[in-house]
């Protein structure tokens, strides 16, 4: 476990005035959002707010690591205990980024901190703290990454000054030695603001349809669902506010319409398995519910979110005003090697 040495709670308030934003980021970042409950200025004490984000950074590595691993890549996807990259014939290799690419990603990270006052970002496909530093350059603690040799790791970027505790990996999510563990952190431990977060990057490939169909990715995802449910149920029993953040590799808007089925160990769908009121209080609210899809850039052809943030009833009850946003990439960076995902943000206020 890791405990932040910083025990004060300096919550900075950043103006949203256009002039200040221009000075910080050049007036080109494209923030698109839809709002529920509040918009613009507020008198809410900043200590009572919480802003969560999740961002899959698509094979984010240092240039040195990318070069070294690319020279000895494997024909198949490496397992969790293998320090290697795939070079599967017929598939696009992990990206190689230039300094300008990293700078563009860093501008998005800067906007998350300075303009949107994000407190914590759940990270996926990041090769640990050194890789994360390529993007999250100032004002963040990069920590609680899962213990995995594979370059695709899950972890957190936590705003400087927020006390936290790393709770260790949710290793059971790696159901076959090749899927990804979950990263688990507690913010403001031991205070009335305490909230526990689980960052996930679930098995890819089973985006829609029941999990019991004869398709290997669905079988793996089906094994992961009870692991998350057990984590959720334990937090409910403890009476701790919590959230799930990450890349679910699932169209949760469709998934949520259908029942989980009678067998908790072999569910048909995700959302109703986790949000089943068993134990009482096991109820989750989803950031993207009812939100139109906002593309990451002009080339984004997706229609639905797979990145999402889910909060429990306790956290929802103390934050009735919630704002969803998606941080799209700058138009001037069209064509750069950034990521096939961009940040999803959920701001919570009383």
For the regions a protein language model found, what residue spans apply to each?
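Bacterial N-terminal signal peptides
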Residues: 19-30
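Bacterial N-terminal signal peptides that target proteins for export
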Residues: 5-21
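Structured beta-strand-rich core segments of catalytic domains in phosphoester-bond hydrolases
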Residues: 120-203
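Stable alpha-helical elements in mature extracytoplasmic
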Residues: 101-108, 128-131, 153, 181, ...
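Catalytic metal-binding/acid-base residues of hydrolase active sites
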Residues: 58, 127, 201-203, 248-251
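Metal-dependent phosphoester-hydrolase catalytic domains
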Residues: 35-45, 230-243, 249-350
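N-terminal, active-site-proximal structural segment of metallo-dependent hydrolase catalytic domains
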Residues: 35-138, 149, 332-336, 340
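Active-site His/acidic residue clusters
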Residues: 199-217
């Amino acid at each position: 476990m890791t405990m932040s040495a910083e025990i004060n709670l300096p919550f900075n308030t950043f103006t949203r005035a256009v002039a200040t934003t221009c000075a910080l980021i050049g007036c080109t970042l494209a923030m698109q959002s839809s709002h529920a409950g509040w918009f613009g200025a507020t008198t809410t004490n900043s200590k009572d707010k919480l802003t969560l984000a999740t961002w899959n950074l698509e094979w984010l590595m240092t240039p040195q690591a990318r070069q070294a691993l690319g020279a000895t890549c494997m024909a198949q996807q490496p397992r969790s205990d293998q320090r290697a990259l795939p070079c599967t014939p017929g598939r696009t290799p992990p990206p190689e980024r230039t300094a300008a690419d990293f700078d563009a990603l860093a501008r998005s990270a800067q906007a998350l901190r300075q303009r949107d006052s994000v407190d914590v970002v759940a990270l996926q496909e990041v090769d640990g703290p050194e890789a994360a530093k390529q993007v999250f350059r100032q004002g963040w603690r990069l920590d609680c990454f899962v213990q995995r040799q594979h370059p695709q790791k899950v972890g957190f970027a936590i705003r400087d000054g927020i006390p936290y505790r790393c709770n260790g990996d949710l290793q059971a999510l790696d159901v076959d030695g090749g899927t990804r563990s979950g990263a688990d952190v507690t913010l403001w431990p031991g205070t009335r603001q305490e909230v526990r977060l689980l960052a996930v990057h679930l098995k890819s490939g089973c985006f829609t349809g029941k999990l019991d169909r004869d398709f290997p990715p669905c079988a793996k995802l089906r094994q992961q669902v009870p692991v998350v449910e057990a984590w959720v149920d334990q937090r409910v029993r403890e009476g701790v506010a919590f959230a799930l953040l990450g890349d679910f590799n699932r169209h949760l808007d469709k998934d949520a319409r259908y029942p989980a089925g009678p067998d908790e160990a072999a569910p048909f769908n995700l959302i109703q398995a986790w949000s089943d009121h068993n134990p009482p209080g096991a109820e989750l609210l989803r950031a993207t519910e009812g939100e139109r899809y906002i593309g990451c850039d002009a080339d984004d052809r997706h229609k639905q979110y797979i990145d999402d943030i889910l909060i429990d009833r306790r956290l929802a009850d103390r934050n009735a005003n919630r704002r969803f946003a998606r941080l799209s990439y700058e138009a001037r960076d069209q064509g750069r090697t950034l990521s096939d995902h961009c940040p999803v943000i959920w701001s919570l206020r009383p």
